[in-house]
Amino acid sequence: MPSISTNIILAFTTALLGTLIYRSHLMSSLLCLEGMMLSMFILTSLTTLNLHFSLTTMAPIILLVFAACEAAIGLALLVMVSNTYGMDYIQNLNLLQC
Protein backbone atom coordinates (compact mmCIF):
# COMPACT_ATOMS: atom_id res chain seq x y z
CA MET A 1 0.00 0.00 0.00
CA PRO A 2 1.49 3.36 -0.95
CA SER A 3 2.35 5.85 1.75
CA ILE A 4 -0.29 8.33 0.55
CA SER A 5 -3.09 5.83 1.11
CA THR A 6 -1.64 4.93 4.49
CA ASN A 7 -1.60 8.59 5.53
CA ILE A 8 -5.18 9.08 4.39
CA ILE A 9 -6.36 5.99 6.27
CA LEU A 10 -4.48 7.27 9.32
CA ALA A 11 -6.24 10.64 8.96
CA PHE A 12 -9.61 8.86 8.78
CA THR A 13 -8.78 6.82 11.87
CA THR A 14 -7.67 9.93 13.75
CA ALA A 15 -10.92 11.72 12.87
CA LEU A 16 -12.90 8.65 13.96
CA LEU A 17 -11.07 8.56 17.28
CA GLY A 18 -11.69 12.30 17.65
CA THR A 19 -15.39 11.67 17.17
CA LEU A 20 -15.32 9.04 19.90
CA ILE A 21 -13.25 11.13 22.32
CA TYR A 22 -14.91 14.55 21.84
CA ARG A 23 -18.49 13.35 21.54
CA SER A 24 -19.84 15.60 24.28
CA HIS A 25 -19.78 18.77 22.14
CA LEU A 26 -21.70 18.99 18.89
CA MET A 27 -19.20 21.32 17.20
CA SER A 28 -16.28 18.96 17.87
CA SER A 29 -18.27 16.03 16.53
CA LEU A 30 -19.14 17.96 13.36
CA LEU A 31 -15.50 18.92 12.77
CA CYS A 32 -14.39 15.32 13.18
CA LEU A 33 -17.11 14.15 10.79
CA GLU A 34 -15.92 16.69 8.23
CA GLY A 35 -12.37 15.37 8.62
CA MET A 36 -13.65 11.86 7.99
CA MET A 37 -15.52 12.97 4.89
CA LEU A 38 -12.47 14.83 3.58
CA SER A 39 -10.24 11.79 3.97
CA MET A 40 -12.89 9.59 2.35
CA PHE A 41 -13.12 12.03 -0.57
CA ILE A 42 -9.36 12.04 -1.11
CA LEU A 43 -9.17 8.24 -0.84
CA THR A 44 -12.08 7.82 -3.28
CA SER A 45 -10.51 10.26 -5.73
CA LEU A 46 -7.15 8.51 -5.60
CA THR A 47 -8.77 5.10 -6.04
CA THR A 48 -10.79 6.36 -9.00
CA LEU A 49 -7.69 7.80 -10.64
CA ASN A 50 -5.73 4.60 -10.10
CA LEU A 51 -8.45 2.31 -11.45
CA HIS A 52 -8.90 4.17 -14.77
CA PHE A 53 -12.52 3.03 -14.75
CA SER A 54 -14.78 5.68 -16.26
CA LEU A 55 -17.96 4.70 -14.43
CA THR A 56 -16.49 5.48 -11.01
CA THR A 57 -15.54 9.07 -11.79
CA MET A 58 -18.82 10.35 -10.32
CA ALA A 59 -18.28 8.68 -6.92
CA PRO A 60 -16.14 11.50 -5.40
CA ILE A 61 -18.65 14.12 -6.54
CA ILE A 62 -21.54 12.17 -5.03
CA LEU A 63 -19.56 11.87 -1.81
CA LEU A 64 -19.04 15.64 -1.78
CA VAL A 65 -22.79 16.18 -2.22
CA PHE A 66 -23.51 13.97 0.79
CA ALA A 67 -20.79 15.75 2.79
CA ALA A 68 -22.33 19.13 1.97
CA CYS A 69 -25.79 17.91 3.01
CA GLU A 70 -24.36 16.50 6.24
CA ALA A 71 -22.60 19.78 7.00
CA ALA A 72 -25.72 21.85 6.32
CA ILE A 73 -27.93 19.69 8.52
CA GLY A 74 -25.28 19.60 11.24
CA LEU A 75 -24.87 23.37 11.28
CA ALA A 76 -28.63 23.89 11.32
CA LEU A 77 -28.87 21.52 14.28
CA LEU A 78 -25.99 23.32 16.00
CA VAL A 79 -27.70 26.70 15.58
CA MET A 80 -31.00 25.30 16.81
CA VAL A 81 -29.46 23.69 19.91
CA SER A 82 -27.29 26.70 20.77
CA ASN A 83 -30.24 29.10 20.43
CA THR A 84 -32.47 26.88 22.54
CA TYR A 85 -30.08 25.81 25.30
CA GLY A 86 -27.21 28.30 25.02
CA MET A 87 -24.58 25.55 24.70
CA ASP A 88 -23.68 22.78 22.29
CA TYR A 89 -23.67 19.77 24.59
CA ILE A 90 -25.06 16.66 22.94
CA GLN A 91 -26.58 15.56 26.25
CA ASN A 92 -29.10 18.41 25.89
CA LEU A 93 -30.17 17.11 22.50
CA ASN A 94 -33.19 14.87 22.85
CA LEU A 95 -34.90 14.30 19.53
CA LEU A 96 -37.97 12.78 21.18
CA GLN A 97 -39.00 16.19 22.55
CA CYS A 98 -40.12 18.60 19.85
From Swiss-Prot:
Which molecular function terms from Gene Ontology are attached? NADH dehydrogenase (ubiquinone) activity
Give the bilayer topology: Multi-pass membrane protein
- The organism named in the record is Otolemur crassicaudatus
Family indicated by similarity: Belongs to the complex I subunit 4L family.
Reaction equation(s) it catalyzes: a ubiquinone + NADH + 5 H(+)(in) = a ubiquinol + NAD(+) + 4 H(+)(out)
Subunit structure, interactors included: Core subunit of respiratory chain NADH dehydrogenase (Complex I) which is composed of 45 different subunits.
- GO BP of this protein: ATP synthesis coupled electron transport
Entry's Gene Ontology cellular component terms: mitochondrial inner membrane; respiratory chain complex I
What does the record give as the organism's lineage? Answer: Eukaryota, Metazoa, Chordata, Craniata, Vertebrata
Q: List the disulfide bonds.
A: none
Keywords in UniProt for this one?
Electron transport, Membrane, Mitochondrion, Mitochondrion inner membrane, NAD, Respiratory chain, Translocase, Transmembrane, Transmembrane helix, Transport, Ubiquinone
Could you list the residue ranges that cross the membrane?
A: 1-21, 26-46, 61-81
Q: What is its EC number?
A: 7.1.1.2
Pfam families given in the database record: Oxidored_q2
> What's this chain's function?
Core subunit of the mitochondrial membrane respiratory chain NADH dehydrogenase (Complex I) which catalyzes electron transfer from NADH through the respiratory chain, using ubiquinone as an electron acceptor. Part of the enzyme membrane arm which is embedded in the lipid bilayer and involved in proton translocation.
Q: Does the keyword Phosphoprotein apply?
A: no
This protein is called: NADH-ubiquinone oxidoreductase chain 4L
Where is this protein found?
Mitochondrion inner membrane
Q: Which PANTHER family match?
A: NADH-UBIQUINONE OXIDOREDUCTASE CHAIN 4L, NADH-UBIQUINONE OXIDOREDUCTASE SUBUNIT ND4L
